[in-house]
Amino acid sequence: MSIEVIRSGLNTTFQDRGRSNFYHLGIPFSGAMDTRNLLITNKLVGNDRNDAVIEFAMQGPKLKIKQNNINCVVTGNVNFTFKKNSKIFNGECYKTFDLNNNDEIDIISTNNSMYGYFSISGGFKLEKKWNSYSTHLRS
């Protein structure tokens, strides 16, 4: 699976449920800010409950898909569009949709909330560090 980042968005990171049992080593818990939406996001696309998702604050990324038939979902209170075959559609949160090679998703902004989530069926191919996919920006 390959995704081209056109715009990174604000505070866009990969997150899961976080890491536990490492704080005594100085490694913070980290993890998604909204665990409920993280779990819903993974459930809607058929992923494991602790698979990584893309978490974003206020403005999300703009991404170009580089593979056919990818099932996606955006959760939270989010304004987003997706472009399929040069036509732009308004997205609906908590509803899955398929994207194909060269289709784009533009996560414009969150509405009355800080965070939103995006994931794909099958998850992202990432390497775990300290038993988690979560990003801790201050580390």
Identify the function of each model-found stretch.
Residues 1-139:
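Conserved "landmark" site that anchors the functional core of diverse proteins
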